[in-house]
């Protein structure tokens, strides 16, 4: 289990991360691109993964980690249920999403 504040701290611990509002939710960005949003009322976190990473993480347990049920889920946006996820799994997902954005910046 991961509480809201711990999830926030995990995201903010990644180098260069900024927290900004995104439609009333905390979002976490690097290079001005969102890699995660915190859904406080729902007690979940959205992590923006590649489709391959989304598939790998979701294979752990589709009740805990699953694509966002809208068009964004088809682009890698993935929900993590904070009440059921281990801190290590969430940290791994956040780091993976953060690395993907940082790597894109270096490609430019």
Q: Residue ranges of each PLM-predicted region?
A:
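Charge-dense, helix-prone N-terminal extensions
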Residues: 1-108
